[in-house]
């Protein structure tokens, strides 16, 4: 992959499970927090996570809980959980994000399993069940997935936190579902690749975006949960 080759990027912002793999493969250099004057602004709630328990490599950039959002004007299905996405009445009427890790996770939850099970038999069974969702899926797209819901092209969608926020701003009439099977949770974080050509620039950028007012602007724009405690007072209601 591009990051195994290295040398092209000074800073990478990635999902937690990807970061875990990158660290395991030696693709991430240890973080020198002393070079980030705004480091103490970070919220410890989003630190010391499974992918970086000692905070040796990463700086959190955002967190979120993917959710189902649906248009009650386009379907009579009362959606209360992931399992409802399989309802035949939603044929060709569901949009999904293009993240297999997440979509496989919600399928596992419909089976009463953990998002993070490592049981291969269970994972294979989830894959088989996921195939049965195909008739209901109209689109799989990671970027601006909410647009299909906003426009009325689909009746239901499984969206990232930022997409949920955007959808509700455009269509307050949409319904948000906190699935009865349980919620997923993820964190994005930044790291400096082992072969970063200009680590100084990466540290300068990390310092800049974690200044309170700058961080607030970032979180208001991306629509994820704020991971910078000092920025909270600058975020609008």
Give the location of each predicted region.
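Short, hydrophobic alpha-helical packing/hinge segments within bilobed ligand-binding/sensory domains
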Residues: 1, 19, 82, 145-148, ...
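Extracytoplasmic ligand-binding site segments that recognize negatively charged/polar headgroups
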Residues: 8-153
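Short, well-structured alpha-helical segments in soluble
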Residues: 2-7
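Generic hydrophobic alpha-helical scaffold/packing signal
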Residues: 146, 150, 168, 193, ...
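Mature extracytoplasmic/periplasmic domains
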Residues: 183, 188, 193-237
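Periplasmic-binding protein-like
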Residues: 124-132, 170-194
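A ligand-binding cleft/hinge motif common to bilobed small-molecule-binding domains
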Residues: 19-21, 150, 156-173
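Generic alpha-helical structural context detector
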Residues: 105-109, 165, 207, 220
């Amino acid at each position: 992959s591009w990051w195994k080759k290295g040398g092209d990027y000074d800073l990478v912002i990635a999902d937690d499970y990807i970061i875990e793999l990158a660290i395991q493969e030696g693709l991430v250099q240890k973080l020198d927090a002393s070079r980030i004057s705004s480091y103490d602004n970070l919220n410890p709630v989003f630190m010391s996570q499974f992918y970086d328990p000692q905070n040796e490599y990463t700086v959190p950039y955002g967190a979120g809980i993917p959710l189902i959002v649906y248009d009650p004007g386009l379907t009579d299905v009362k959606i209360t959980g992931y399992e409802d996405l399989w309802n035949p009445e939603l044929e060709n009427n569901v949009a999904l994000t293009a993240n297999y890790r997440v979509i496989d996770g919600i399928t596992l939850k419909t089976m009463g399993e953990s998002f993070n099970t490592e049981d291969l038999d269970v994972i294979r069974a989830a894959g088989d069940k996921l195939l049965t969702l195909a008739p209901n899926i109209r689109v799989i797209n990671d970027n601006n997935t909410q647009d299909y819901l906003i426009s009325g092209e689909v009746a239901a969608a499984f969206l990232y936190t930022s997409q949920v926020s955007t959808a509700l701003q455009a269509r307050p009439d949409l319904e948000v579902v906190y699935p009865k099977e349980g919620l997923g949770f993820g964190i994005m974080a930044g790291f400096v690749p082992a072969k970063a050509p200009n680590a100084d620039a990466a540290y300068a950028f990390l310092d800049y975006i974690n200044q309170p007012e700058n961080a607030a602007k970032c979180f208001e724009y991306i629509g994820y949960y704020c991971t910078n405690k000092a920025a909270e007072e600058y975020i609008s209601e």
